[in-house]
Every structure is written in C-alpha cells, then in structure tokens.
Regions:
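Short beta-strand->loop
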Residues: 52-62, 134-139, 146-160
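Secondary-structure junction motif
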Residues: 42, 86-107, 171-175, 179
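Ligand-binding cleft/hinge of the Venus flytrap
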Residues: 4-13, 97-110
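Flexible hinge/capping segments at coil-to-helix
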Residues: 50-61, 65-87, 172-175
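A late-sequence structural motif
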Residues: 148-183
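Conserved functional loop/turn residues at catalytic and ligand-binding sites
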Residues: 16, 30, 34-35, 55, ...
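A ligand-binding cleft/hinge motif common to bilobed small-molecule-binding domains
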Residues: 25, 32, 36, 40-50, ...
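Central regulatory/effector-binding core of bacterial HTH transcription factors
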Residues: 1-46, 116-117
Length: 183
C-alpha cells in the first residue's frame, strides 16, 4: 500500500491530500458531514448504508508480551491461553477493542483490562514494563520495541485496513486514489 500511495501522490501533484489522524468514529462523523472524502481504519467491514469500504491491506492481530512472559516460548499462541492474563489496551473509541473482546468471548473468556491508555506506544511501553499483554496489529511488530516480543495467534484475527467513502459522493480525485490503491 505504501508504494501505491507514493505513486498516486507523485502522479497526481495537483490533488491535495490532507492526512488527519482521527479515531474511526470521528472519521465516520466527518464522512457523514461530507467534511472528508475518505477515511482509513481497521476492520471497517460493515459501513453504514450509503457508504462503501474497500480492503487496502490484509493484516492480523498479534499478542505483544514482555520478553520474560511464560508464553514467550510459544511460536504461536492460542487465544484461549490468554484467558488469565492482564491486558493493557486503548479505550474502544480509539481502537478495535470491542471487536477483540467479542473474539475473546467467542473462545470462552472476557479479557481483564488492567490499564487503558490513549496511545499504542504507551501500551507497548507498559507491556515492556511487565504490566500486562496486549493484542495489537502486526504492523507494530515491524518496529523495535525493547522488552517486548510479538507472537502470532493460533487463530488468525484480522486487522485489515479499509478505506471508507460515501458511495454517492465520489470525486474524480477519489476515483484516481481508489484505482491506485486497488492495484
């Protein structure tokens, strides 16, 4: 997706692209007020009526844990093995935590959240201190987080990125962007 985005920006220098970091609910509100042409967030699989979502990037959630954690020797971690763990998360308004709670409940447990913070970097800092574990998109494992190890889950939990837009308000620039990102 990164290379496709770069190419789009290079090939369309007259298209003004503004990046505004907003939580999914805020992006949706901006889309509904037509103050935003498109939003990008994880797991936008069921947009409201009149909106379309297009998957841009396939991704999965991993478990992040302190290096010395008792599950660190596992090459893949069954979700059920997290039943008695303490979790550090972000509030549901900032992240996919409601979705992840439902996934955990489907295998028979409700995660015990010991801390909620607003930034993923703070979540991982707390994990490195041994405060708890977290479920986080695999893109975070590409960065160096001292004291934290990432393990795939035995059950794939999607963390796919989607672009969301109003079906009847597609601008020529958005058509070009969608075409570039779909390649």
């Amino acid at each position: 997706m990164l290379f496709r985005s770069r190419r789009f920006l290079r090939e369309n220098p007259n298209v003004e692209v503004l990046f505004r970091e907003k939580m999914p609910a805020m992006q949706m509100a901006l889309l509904e007020r037509r103050e935003l042409d498109a939003g990008i967030w994880r797991m936008a699989t069921e947009p409201p009526a009149g909106f379309t979502s297009l998957r841009l990037h396939e991704s999965a959630f991993l478990v992040a844990m302190p290096e010395e954690h008792h599950l660190s020797s596992f090459s893949t971690v069954p979700l059920e093995a997290l039943r008695d763990e303490y979790f550090v998360t972000m509030p549901p308004v900032y992240t996919d935590w409601d979705f992840l709670q439902r996934v955990c409940q489907q295998v028979g447990f409700s995660p015990v959240v010991i801390r909620e913070v607003n930034e993923p970097q703070t979540v991982l800092a707390m994990v490195s201190m041994g405060i708890g574990i977290t479920l986080i998109a695999d893109s975070y494992a590409q960065m160096n987080w001292p004291g934290v190890i990432f393990r795939p889950l035995k059950e794939r939990i999607p963390a796919d990125l989607y672009i969301v837009y109003e079906t009847q308000q597609v601008t020529p620039a958005l058509v070009k962007l969608l075409a570039a990102l779909a390649q």
